[in-house]
Amino acid sequence: MENQLAKSIEERTFQYQDSLPPLPVPSLEESLKKYLESVKPFANEDEYKKTEEIVQKFQDGVGKTLHQKLLERAKGKRNWLEEWWLNVAYLDVRIPSQLNVNFVGPSPHFEHYWPAREGTQLERGSILLWHNLNYWQLLRREKLPVHKSGNTPLDMNQFRMLFSTCKVPGITRDSIMNYFKTESEGHCPTHIAVLCRGRAFVFDVLHDGCLITPPELLRQLTYIYQKCWNEPVGPSIAALTSEERTRWAKAREYLIGLDPENLTLLEKIQSSLFVYSIEDTSPHATPENFSQVFEMLLGGDPAVRWGDKSYNLISFANGIFGCSCDHAPYDAMLMVNIAHYVDEKLLETEGRWKGSEKVRDIPLPEELAFTVDEKILNDVYQAKAQHLKAASDLQIAASTFTSFGKKLTKKEALHPDTFIQLALQLAYYRLHGRPGCCYETAMTRYFYHGRTETVRSCTVEAVRWCQSMQDPSASLLERQQKMLDAFAKHNKMMRDCSHGKGFDRHLLGLLLIAKEEGLPVPELFEDPLFSRSGGGGNFVLSTSLVGYLRIQGVVVPMVHNGYGFFYHIRDDRFVVTCSSWRSCLETDAEKLVEMIFHAFHDMIHLMNTAHL
């Protein structure tokens, strides 16, 4: 990172924003052709024929009109999708977002200098906070290197949403408050919020214009910790953020109505750089087994998470750390970036603070004392109960495959991401006896304010290969050829999607134009094959590559009978995390992971033996 920083001295983090190309609108014909191809694995002959007719009718009729209107919209906006995506994918959603939408991940420090150890929470926390604050300062000064693909700069806009950002609940639609500014843009908030035992505190991280040091941060954390443990538990207002969105919006309005000062306190949390959570539980965590960390990050005490914050940094009693982040303002690659930066710093310093132990005379943290009544306390009680009940239904399997990793797949000329995606397809096919419609995230950051596109990994080629693997009469050579066809197809789709040639966001745009124009929903979107193939947020497999660093994350499944599957890739291993719901009797995250590891071996075996 330091070398990168040195190299990028002349480049400012956000300097290329204005020169990025606008998000393109793909060709209607191409999108519909790709869509038809994607429904094939889920249709019999008659169903496919019917869908083909529906698509043709759409292409020649209303689809053409909607596409023209979409092109018109795109003329006036550098990103025709941005506002729509934010609303439809996040802000209009009414289910509790802390459990169902947020992404979480453990900090990887337990793999090296910070194994789980009781009594380390506050000291480690102060060091971790300091590195996070240094990253914030780099961003404020625009010294964070611009992300690039080769020499092409990628969109950096989401980095504005990492700090001092919060979702605010609304009756029908939430909104996002963002208070971050770069130094050249002016003043921005400089305080963090700390949640501990149902109470909330804030303190400034600058003193005399400089960041406060780890010993000073430790003084602040110790003050809060001792106060909370020596006095009764607080009203746990934060738990309300884990509620159903409209219920939380009404509770928030009521809270503000009780006392206008409550709004001032809420705004202090909203505008804080991030929330630091002090948990009093200790999840089991070793490099081989850290499922419990994920369970506690997603389903832990809602009284010490502000579910709507773009960044909750969570500390556990045994010195294990992690994060819970609202997904609305940004995608997980941001968290991967800051988490990796912090982890590298901890490795450099052997997990210790080596600077001055001096503690200056800095103001003590300020407690945010909300005015509450019986109704609010009852709302808090209900919120906690619903969150903990829903979270107890979650099954998480986090596991590390150590037989081989990227090094071997590259040697076999197989793209490691595609390798894992196809292993997942085979595992699902073996476990459930049918193809599983699958969403893999592709990034579209080549374009202005680009975020994501859907790669539909369950291709005709992938299914043919899965079938051959289960067919005793198929030769090794035939299986290998089918697998390589599936690889080629997936790699092409990923390239297309990253370069603005996907079709899922395009179809969403056409549907939203119809809605805005007050037109009936086109038949294409009512067709059973639309949802059976994953359309309308119905993907049974919701997946994402977290990257090639030491960082791991997870999100809950998109549908009740589905899985969330997230993974990162290293030279010598694949680290995977799978989520499912216990109340769904047909899914089992642990079994699926077992089958995936089995598939990894089968695939490499195929490459090694097929040419003998």
Swiss-Prot record:
<feature type="binding site">
    <location>
        <position position="439"/>
    </location>
    <ligand>
        <name>(R)-carnitine</name>
    </ligand>
</feature>
<feature type="modified residue" description="N6-succinyllysine; alternate">
    <location>
        <position position="406"/>
    </location>
</feature>
<keyword id="KW-0443">Lipid metabolism</keyword>
<comment type="pathway">
    <text>Lipid metabolism; fatty acid beta-oxidation.</text>
</comment>
<dbReference type="GO" id="GO:0006635">
    <property type="term" value="P:fatty acid beta-oxidation"/>
</dbReference>
<feature type="binding site">
    <location>
        <position position="406"/>
    </location>
    <ligand>
        <name>CoA</name>
    </ligand>
</feature>
<dbReference type="GO" id="GO:0006631">
    <property type="term" value="P:fatty acid metabolic process"/>
</dbReference>
<dbReference type="Pfam" id="PF00755">
    <property type="entry name" value="Carn_acyltransf"/>
</dbReference>
<dbReference type="InterPro" id="IPR039551">
    <property type="entry name" value="Cho/carn_acyl_trans"/>
</dbReference>
<dbReference type="GO" id="GO:0005777">
    <property type="term" value="C:peroxisome"/>
</dbReference>
<keyword id="KW-0012">Acyltransferase</keyword>
<feature type="short sequence motif" description="Microbody targeting signal">
    <location>
        <begin position="610"/>
        <end position="612"/>
    </location>
</feature>
<dbReference type="InterPro" id="IPR042231">
    <property type="entry name" value="Cho/carn_acyl_trans_2"/>
</dbReference>
<dbReference type="InterPro" id="IPR000542">
    <property type="entry name" value="Carn_acyl_trans"/>
</dbReference>
<dbReference type="GO" id="GO:0009410">
    <property type="term" value="P:response to xenobiotic stimulus"/>
</dbReference>
<keyword id="KW-0813">Transport</keyword>
<feature type="binding site">
    <location>
        <begin position="410"/>
        <end position="417"/>
    </location>
    <ligand>
        <name>CoA</name>
    </ligand>
</feature>
<feature type="binding site">
    <location>
        <position position="441"/>
    </location>
    <ligand>
        <name>(R)-carnitine</name>
    </ligand>
</feature>
<dbReference type="GO" id="GO:0015936">
    <property type="term" value="P:coenzyme A metabolic process"/>
</dbReference>
<dbReference type="GO" id="GO:0051791">
    <property type="term" value="P:medium-chain fatty acid metabolic process"/>
</dbReference>
<dbReference type="InterPro" id="IPR023213">
    <property type="entry name" value="CAT-like_dom_sf"/>
</dbReference>
<keyword id="KW-0276">Fatty acid metabolism</keyword>
<dbReference type="GO" id="GO:0001579">
    <property type="term" value="P:medium-chain fatty acid transport"/>
</dbReference>
<dbReference type="InterPro" id="IPR042572">
    <property type="entry name" value="Carn_acyl_trans_N"/>
</dbReference>
<keyword id="KW-0808">Transferase</keyword>
<dbReference type="GO" id="GO:0008458">
    <property type="term" value="F:carnitine O-octanoyltransferase activity"/>
</dbReference>
<keyword id="KW-0007">Acetylation</keyword>
<dbReference type="GO" id="GO:0015908">
    <property type="term" value="P:fatty acid transport"/>
</dbReference>
<feature type="modified residue" description="N-acetylmethionine">
    <location>
        <position position="1"/>
    </location>
</feature>
<feature type="modified residue" description="N6-acetyllysine; alternate">
    <location>
        <position position="406"/>
    </location>
</feature>
<feature type="active site" description="Proton acceptor">
    <location>
        <position position="327"/>
    </location>
</feature>
<dbReference type="GO" id="GO:0071874">
    <property type="term" value="P:cellular response to norepinephrine stimulus"/>
</dbReference>
<feature type="binding site">
    <location>
        <position position="452"/>
    </location>
    <ligand>
        <name>(R)-carnitine</name>
    </ligand>
</feature>
<comment type="function">
    <text>Beta-oxidation of fatty acids. The highest activity concerns the C6 to C10 chain length substrate.</text>
</comment>
<dbReference type="GO" id="GO:0006091">
    <property type="term" value="P:generation of precursor metabolites and energy"/>
</dbReference>
<dbReference type="GO" id="GO:0015909">
    <property type="term" value="P:long-chain fatty acid transport"/>
</dbReference>
<keyword id="KW-0576">Peroxisome</keyword>
<comment type="similarity">
    <text>Belongs to the carnitine/choline acetyltransferase family.</text>
</comment>
<feature type="modified residue" description="N6-succinyllysine">
    <location>
        <position position="57"/>
    </location>
</feature>
<protein>
    <recommendedName>
        <fullName>Peroxisomal carnitine O-octanoyltransferase</fullName>
        <ecNumber>2.3.1.137</ecNumber>
    </recommendedName>
</protein>
<feature type="modified residue" description="N6-succinyllysine">
    <location>
        <position position="40"/>
    </location>
</feature>
<dbReference type="GO" id="GO:0009437">
    <property type="term" value="P:carnitine metabolic process"/>
</dbReference>
